[in-house]
Amino acid sequence: MATKPGIIPSERVTLTRALPFGVPKFMVSTVATGLAKFGEYTKTKDIIIMHSVADIAGLNRVTRSVMWKAAVSVAAMARSDERRVTEVRGRVPVAMSMLGTTTPGALRAIATLERHGFEVVAFHQNGTGGIAMEDMIREGVFRGVLDMNTHEIGDRVVRGLHGAIADYRLESAGAMGLPQVVAPGSAYYTVQGPVDELTENMRGRKMIAHNVHHTLVRL
């Protein structure tokens, strides 16, 4: 468990991120509310964040209550037998990438693989999902990879909203010696911000306003 007062560097959270998927990770923070962004702390890891309510400046009736609940939560997760609910006996785990525009094909692939004894875990290609998938491949979670959506790579080239990926995207399966199928799903567009904030170059292209915050622009 890590505490994260707003003015203290995040080294302790970095240590928490080093733990593999499934190990309970809990962060109590003074900034876990409002407009604070947590991507720099959690990145691709399964970290639970709890607001401290009061400032972390010693123990009192408020901070004791918060810390107690956090400690009990971590202890309960550590003592639970997660495998009873997470492991599907006899199923071979396979990682798959997908996004909205490739959902129909992805669902058919999932149905086919499940009929043949595989358990498919899908990762949303939003700039975090792809690297979360790569990290878990490197942790040895999966036995194969169906990379149906490479949208994040194109978004990285044009600095789209889903382009915050690491250099080892597409490389983990090969590094682990796993079978991998790659398809250029959703590689033909980038996800940008609101229409009225697009650059002149982007405005001259075909586009679809996905919602008020996101615009899909043809590459």
PLM segments and residue spans:
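Short coil/turn connectors at secondary-structure junctions
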Residues: 20-25, 43-47, 89-94, 116-118, ...
